[in-house]
Amino acid sequence: IAYTIWKCKQNADKNVIILGQDQQLYFKQVAAIVEELGYERPDVVHYAFVMLVEGKMSTRQGTVVLLEDFMREAVTKADKAIVEREKVSDIERAKKVAYSAVKYSMEKISTERNVIFDWEQALNFEGDTAPYLLYSYVRINSILSKRDDINELDINYGLLNHPTEIELINLLYDFPKAVQKAKLEYSPHVITHYAFDLAKKFSLFYHECSVLNAEDILLTNARIKLIKCIKQVMENAFDILGLQLVEHM
């Protein structure tokens, strides 16, 4: 109660309490006391349980996993995945991939649903995972490393008329709305769904629309500008979600 009152006195735009679903009665009691003392009732987000594929963690049964051990295991598994793909170990990059994978796996699930954490799925480079998003980001950087010297004041956007390009442009336009929805509803999964959709659309664009070998230089420049915009929005989404960027995958 004292902590909640202290938060009320900080003049923040929002006062939010994050609790497990099993703490709903506790919050009602705290909120009632705070209101009775003359303070504004804080908002609350009730999260469901996080469980491993092996089952629910339980202190009584001795199946609780400490966060420190959990994250250490995540790094080990991420580095193993990197070695399998590249034949070389990279612990620093493994940390970024692992931490991002754990965060994303939990953020992509709506708060009222239990999170079933699966190592194999979380660290997969395909599907709705952080490694897949990071791989898409790295692919964009690879293209830009080969051609980034365009005159952005002389771009013919009318050349971006391929159906996939139009879908990407519309999706980029929707990003602020996705952020606003996530903010108002306290729902980070709105951003994860958006980021995954953007990565999928970019992958389709990558295979359907040549960038460096387009029909002419004007179309190449327009497509370079488009993927620059995709990169910026991806970085913004990753920043909101707390995902760590990597230079290569």
Which residue stretches match the model-derived regions?
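Non-catalytic interaction-recognition regions
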Residues: 1-249
